[in-house]
Amino acid sequence: MYTIEQIKEVIPHRYPFLLVDRILEVEEGKRAVGIKNVTANEEFFNGHFPDYNVMPGVLIVEALAQVGAFAVLKMEQNQGKLAFFAGIENCRFKRQVVPGDQLRLEVELTKLRGPIGKGRATATVDGEVACTAELTFAIK
């Protein structure tokens, strides 16, 4: 398990854009599982939506991308590099994410070729799928 401080040693994101609170599992270059505790104090709830707080779908996808980046950047040959979000396919949102939810973020890397990779990503809340997507990233 990796704490927030250990996560910050691997990926460059910081508040308010660090969207992963803990990494529960990692198989370097293969997969990672993380969590995001969604609280009413999230900055994005000030505008999305003040009277009906819903986590923006694009931020769920970004949280998934950060977990995928962790799996890739933990690899010895990628340490000290950056992982850039390069594309998304087949993204589906199946459940709203609201304050009090804990997002479980799972990314399985399906392809790594040179500086480009792909991953299958799933975000769940209490076992219920909130989002699925296929992510593409580039390492620099």
From Swiss-Prot:
The keyword Lyase applies. Keywords: Cytoplasm, Lipid A biosynthesis, Lipid biosynthesis, Lipid metabolism, Lyase. Gene3D superfamilies: Hotdog Thioesterase. Coiled coil: none annotated. One of its GO terms (molecular function) is (3R)-hydroxyacyl-[acyl-carrier-protein] dehydratase activity. GO terms for cellular component: cytoplasm; membrane. It comes from the Bacteria. The active site is at H48. Its main location: cytoplasm. It catalyses: a (3R)-hydroxyacyl-[ACP] = a (2E)-enoyl-[ACP] + H2O. It is found in: Cytoplasm. The keyword Protein biosynthesis does not apply. Its EC number is 4.2.1.59. GO terms for biological process: fatty acid biosynthetic process; lipid A biosynthetic process. HAMAP family: FabZ (MF_00406). Involved in unsaturated fatty acids biosynthesis. Catalyzes the dehydration of short chain beta-hydroxyacyl-ACPs and long chain saturated and unsaturated beta-hydroxyacyl-ACPs. Belongs to the thioester dehydratase family. FabZ subfamily. This is 3-hydroxyacyl-[acyl-carrier-protein] dehydratase FabZ.
